Amino acid sequence: MKVLWFAVNPSLYDAHRNGEHNGGGWIASLEKIIRTSDNIRLGVAFEHPDPIFKKEIDGVCYYPIRVKPGLRRRIYASEKDKIIIADCLKVIEDFKPDIIHVFGSEWGFGLVEKYVDIPVVIHMQGSLPPYVNASYPPGYNFFTQWKTSHYNPIVLLKRRFVWSRNDNYKVAREIDILKHCRYVMGRTNWDYNITRLYAPDSQYYHCNEALRPVFFNPPKTWTFRQRKRIQLLSVGSCSMVKGMDLLLKTAKLLKDHTDFDFEWLIAGPTGSFSFFEKNERTPHDAVNIKFLGTLSAEDLAVQLAEADIYVHTAYIDNSPNSLCEAQIILSLIHISEPTRRRGI
């Protein structure tokens, strides 16, 4: 069977030259599993700057899709999609798959379903319609961002003529993709409910995500430690929905109003963390927060084993792999609203 993926990252394509990557590890982990199957011929298509049509590595046929430069293509998602879809159809014609697997309904790849008779399954990741409804955390809005730019008029123009247009287009695009899809895969109640809303006639399959192998057999094992200073660990980025403002507020409350002795480690890119520090008027080092930077899978597994509690701060997330990886290694605080179960 020939299976073609349209993926949001290069999976293992760059592994031979860059080493293991960190973001989107579920796709690379799944590819490693698929490679062990003798009866599946895998193709992987993705955006990439390499100026080649295809390249075969270790039995997998990779299709790096290079978006040609152009001002409108760089600015507007709708213009970029026109180029991407044309290239996707060329990939389909060359690979001739039996099944097409699209990672994420919120990306433009799912539009290919309109143009082919081959079965296309949409693999749910996030979902933009509910995300856009909660774009900013409490106390934040566009003017918070604008103030941080020192009221730069270019930022205001981008908001009016680019960002809003792209947001509206992407929401409409995802709804259109789901309404046309015949097959969908998900793993949460949220996935199921969203697809029943926008694609009630589609066939739904439950599909758990593949985690990075090192977390199943970590280099260090978590054990309970009786120590004075508790070590908290969070993994994430500094986008608005990831709860960095909440993390800062919580750390400040703990530092100023309790005797709780803690150190709060953050793994992941924190280049934009200063935005939240300015708005909360709280420097991270004043409230026992320490940045670890982006870690390899092995180093992150060790950090999880050394932490006492994992804290996931995101306002919106859909069974994120960072949380799933943490659950394998250590105890954590997590509120699961659909099941009404709370606790450590």
Per-range role (PLM):
Residues M1-P51, K252:
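N-terminal subdomain of nucleotide-sugar transferases
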Residues L4, F215, T223-K242, L248-A251:
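Conserved donor-binding/catalytic core segment of Leloir-type glycosyltransferases
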Residues S29, L128, Q145-V184, N193, ...:
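Membrane-proximal helix-turn-helix segments that form the acceptor-binding/catalytic region
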Residues I92, T294-L295, V302-A307:
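Short alpha-helical donor nucleotide-sugar binding micro-motif in glycosyltransferases
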Residues R196, A210-R229, V302:
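Acidic anion/phosphate-binding donor-loop and adjacent secondary structure
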Residues G268, F276-E298:
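Nucleotide-activated donor-binding/catalytic signature segment of Leloir-type glycosyltransferases, i.e.
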Residues Y315:
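Aromatic "clamp/platform" in nucleotide-sugar-dependent glycosyltransferases that forms part
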Residues I333-I344:
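Single conserved hydrophobic/aromatic residue that forms the stacking wall/gate
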